[in-house]
Amino acid sequence: MTRAETKERNRRALLDAAFHVVSRDGHRARLDEIAERAGLTTGAVYSLFGSKSGLLGALVTDYLQPHYEEIEQAIPADADLLGAVDAFARYYRRTCDAADAPADQSLQFTLLDMALHDAEVGPRLAASVRAEESRLIALFAGRPHEGALVTQGQAHRLTTALRAVLIGLSQGVLLGLAPGADEQYFADTARALVSGATLLEEPGAGAGRA
């Protein structure tokens, strides 16, 4: 095995170990236990990720990347903005029915708990989420909507709202609080954020309105 292959194997082992320990212990997860579960030392964590927060940031990226790859496949390249938003919302609803949906939701809650308890971890996790979120912004930017193309800024504003609404709805589905929220409900809710175009205005664009 080459040095690069060994490095990648160790990296993968630490990420897998971090997933299990963090999911179980939350902000009380200990670096030495993560390293031990991976069959490595804490020195390997610092060598590969720089710090505990670096490992957790990489864990978020590792967790989100497959989802964004699936989203990119689910949204038709030739769809207008409403069509893209509709496809994104329907994909999001389908993830609620996946076998690993409860575990994914648990990890989300756990990472949020860690971000609130650790001043160093919070910004690192937020940076990882923003980096992956930029891929979603790119999926919406440039699509036609009401005779114009969606700008990068508009796509950013829309993405922020979409993720907030759909994450909340998904939690409701998994907790049994939104039993009637099927794919159509998700799609209608998401499309409503675009209808009226107020959300799509650039900041300050409506300042002069009466």
Short names for language-model regions:
Residues 9, 13, 17-62:
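Helix-turn-helix
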Residues 23-27, 72, 76-79, 97, ...:
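Short, flexible helix-adjacent loops and helix caps
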Residues 3, 122-126, 130, 145-210:
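Hydrophobic/aromatic-rich alpha-helical bundle segments in the mid-to-C-terminal region
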Residues 10, 52, 59, 63-67, ...:
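Hydrophobic/aromatic residues within well-ordered alpha-helical segments
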Residues 99-126:
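Amphipathic alpha-helical segments used for helix-helix packing
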Residues 58, 72-105, 151, 155-162, ...:
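Hydrophobic alpha-helical connector segments
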Residues 17-24, 70-74, 107, 111, ...:
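Solvent-exposed, amphipathic alpha-helical segments
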Residues 26, 50-54, 58, 76-79, ...:
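Residues in soluble alpha-helical coiled-coils and helical-bundle/repeat scaffolds
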